[in-house]
Amino acid sequence: MVAALALASCAGIGTVSQEEVTSEAQRRGGGITTHLVDAAVEAVAEETGRDPLPVHSIFATLAQVTITVPSADGSPGRDVWSYGTSGLYGGRGLTGPAVAGESAAGTFAVATGDLDVDAAGATARDAGGPGTWVESVTIARPGEGAEPVLSVVVTDGATSQTIAVEGSR
């Protein structure tokens, strides 16, 4: 009887829609929002004592942000910080730094309020067409000396496309 109940409750796992997952992440304080990215930038800046924060890249998914910054000890390596707001897709709060290898890309300064992820997501969803949702957001320099680019990956569940969003920084 217990096994049948467990099996019956597992049968519903595959029927959860992306909208339900996104709604649940938002309810728990997550989602890919300007607020989430600002909270992550603020947490790393506070922990490292750097404001504005020198950044190699920022990668945001549902309720989780990963920020790569120059190593705090001045070595050519990078420190990788993770910030999550939801138990649904990872831990709560700030974790790190994990040490990564050297980076060829230069840094750019980011302070709370510098990035409008909400507007970039809306622009990308419009470009992606009906029924698309934001899967991830990346902010990085495409090369040394280049301006940072905000790229948004949108999907309809079957296919994904990356859209570079102008003027989001």
Question: Residue ranges of each PLM-predicted region?
Answer:
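Sec-dependent N-terminal signal peptides
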Residues: 1-4
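C-terminal motif of bacterial Sec signal peptides marking the signal peptidase cleavage site
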Residues: 6-9
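Bacterial signal peptide processing site
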Residues: 11-14
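A cross-kingdom feature marking solvent-exposed beta-strand/loop segments within repeated
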Residues: 21-57, 134-137
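N-terminal non-globular leader segments, chiefly Sec-dependent signal peptides
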Residues: 25, 82-89
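Exposed beta-strand-loop-beta-strand "reactive/processing" segments of non-cytosolic proteins
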Residues: 43-81, 138-165
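Long, charged/polar, surface-exposed segments that mediate recognition or autoinhibition
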Residues: 87-135
